[in-house]
């Protein structure tokens, strides 16, 4: 495949949210991130741009491949020390309303604007075996280059669903059979390690570090106990605590149920 002026224009446009929306594509850069994409969703790959070094590191690359010099690759790379490989992929479509989630509970992100946190949460969620991640408007683009790099491409193995706000998210969750919403709070709420129904057909909402979770009438509040009396954890840290508390419960269940 040859690198044309049109292809170069597309590569540059995908650094912006507008460009991704207009084209329906995104960038996936780095050996591990593109490797996850190639393994999980090879049908999404439109083409790959790589240096000789990057192509050798990847081995088998699906679809069309364009080999470029290190200097030319640097024009498209968003990293200082690139690994010499990036793929252009179609943004996966969101699951339809006729495709209900299969997870025992749902993790939702409310107005989470930091791509590093968003990507880390995708990666952590993927490690637990869960498949759904919901988020509200005001959150970062899950397919921005920073979010994809932070996640190492994990979002391509997940079902991501976006909503206008928490209320519309709650309504759809209830239709799917997840009636209870837990809002995470750094200061008040039930202890997450003692909340027996926390992962029982529920929605656990993580908010932005600066603003927290939006208000939602009728939702329960749950907190991570912090004996050190620190202000708060960042969103990715908090999500990790909740996700691996879920893992702890399913791997060492109590005789009477999920809570041990």
Give the label of every model feature segment.
Residues 1-55, 139-141:
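Boundary-proximal intrinsically disordered activation/regulatory segments immediately upstream
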Residues 24, 109-113, 223-231:
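Short pre-catalytic strand/loop immediately N-terminal to key active-site residues, enriched for Gly-Thr
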Residues 30, 113-120, 233-238:
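Amphipathic alpha-helical repeat scaffolds
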Residues 60-71, 104, 198-202, 218-224:
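Active-site regions of enzymes building and remodeling cell-envelope glycoconjugates
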Residues 62-90:
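Glycine/small-residue-rich loop that forms an oxyanion/phosphate-binding "nest" at active or ligand-binding sites
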Residues 87, 126-128, 142-155, 215-260:
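Structured adenosyl-cofactor binding patch, chiefly the S-adenosyl-L-methionine
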Residues 93, 97-187:
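RNA substrate-binding interface of SAM-dependent RNA methyltransferases
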Residues 182-230:
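Active-site/ligand-binding-proximal alpha/beta "capping" segment
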């Amino acid at each position: 495949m040859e690198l044309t002026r049109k292809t170069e224009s597309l590569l540059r446009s995908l650094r912006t949210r507008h460009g991704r929306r207009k084209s329906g594509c995104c960038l996936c850069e780095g050996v591990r991130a593109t490797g996850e994409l190639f393994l999980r969703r090879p049908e999404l790959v439109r083409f790959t741009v790589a240096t000789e070094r990057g192509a050798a590191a990847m081995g088998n690359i699906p679809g069309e491949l364009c080999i470029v010099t290190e200097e030319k690759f640097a024009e498209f790379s968003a990293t200082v020390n690139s690994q010499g490989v990036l793929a252009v992929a179609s943004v996966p479509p969101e699951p339809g309303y006729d495709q209900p989630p299969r997870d025992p509970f749902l993790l939702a992100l409310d107005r989470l604007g930091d791509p590093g946190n968003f990507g880390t949460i995708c990666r952590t969620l993927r490690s637990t075996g869960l498949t759904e991640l919901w988020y509200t408007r005001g959150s970062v683009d899950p397919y921005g280059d920073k979010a994809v790099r932070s996640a190492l491409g994990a979002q391509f193995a997940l079902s991501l669903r976006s909503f206008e706000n928490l209320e519309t998210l709650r309504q759809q969750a209830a239709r799917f059979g997840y009636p209870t919403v837990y809002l995470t709070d750094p200061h008040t709420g039930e202890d997450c390690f003692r909340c027996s129904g926390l992962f029982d057909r529920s929605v656990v909402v993580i908010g932005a570090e600066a603003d927290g979770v939006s208000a939602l009438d009728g939702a329960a509040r749950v907190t991570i106990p912090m004996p050190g009396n620190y202000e708060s954890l960042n969103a990715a840290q908090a999500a990790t605590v909740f996700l691996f508390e879920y893992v702890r419960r399913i791997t060492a269940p109590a005789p009477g149920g999920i809570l041990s």
